[in-house]
């Protein structure tokens, strides 16, 4: 048995087409164009690539994209003032602060400064709390994208044993809440979990977001399980690999996401989806 691939690039492209269609319909109806403001502090190469992709995505679907590229020595006060201005700007539906930030800046305070109805990354405690209370509003983009990928398989998630490897605020913790909402029985683990192999081996569904290449071995995977690999790690030879050993997981899994081309494109597409949702549901 070889796993079926969950093609994140194709699913994300379809989602972008749907969003672009809706933006065009809004224009025909005389409604305003959704707007996304993206703040980049410093010149981290990976962040610059991510931000350029997000701006390109905005152009593709017809959003208005506002770019704020700030020097690495930007102060906390200056960033706070910018966020406050964007919070009050009626043309802006979403404010995205690209992480990581330079060490002298307090990311938590800045993320909390973004108004919850413009927090299209879904990182604000208000939005995380809504998800925890089973009344999600703006959902964290990567877990939201993963749920869309899982829906594409047609597999009924209700009652499945799900294991999340990684407990970050951005992926692991909100992912566990999304899976609970879908009716899974969820175990949250991390790279220091005792008998990680045992936990993974019992799972019908595994979501790995630990940021450690090759952490989850293919032979750990339960035959037929769904494997979602959030990891994206660049090797010395330049090749991108996930947190799962793909080659040995492929013959055991029922479904699997590739790296690259799996989760990453969906994270970006869900940022657009959240921005459209904010425009139509929270701001119109």
Swiss-Prot record:
Enzyme Commission number(s) from the entry: 1.5.1.5, 3.5.4.9
GO cellular component, one term: cytosol
Signal peptide: none
Positions bound to NADP(+): 166-168, 232
Keyword terms, alphabetized: Amino-acid biosynthesis, Histidine biosynthesis, Hydrolase, Methionine biosynthesis, Multifunctional enzyme, NADP, One-carbon metabolism, Oxidoreductase, Purine biosynthesis
GO molecular function, one term: methylenetetrahydrofolate dehydrogenase (NADP+) activity
CDD domains hit by this protein: NAD_bind_m-THF_DH_Cyclohyd
Single GO biological process annotation from the record: methionine biosynthetic process
Subunit record text: Homodimer.
PANTHER family assigned: C-1-TETRAHYDROFOLATE SYNTHASE, CYTOPLASMIC, C-1-TETRAHYDROFOLATE SYNTHASE, CYTOPLASMIC-RELATED
HAMAP family named among the record's database cross-references: THF_DHG_CYH
Protein name according to UniProt: Bifunctional protein FolD 1
Organism in which the protein naturally occurs: Pseudomonas syringae pv. syringae (strain B728a)
Organism ancestry: Bacteria, Pseudomonadati, Pseudomonadota, Gammaproteobacteria, Pseudomonadales
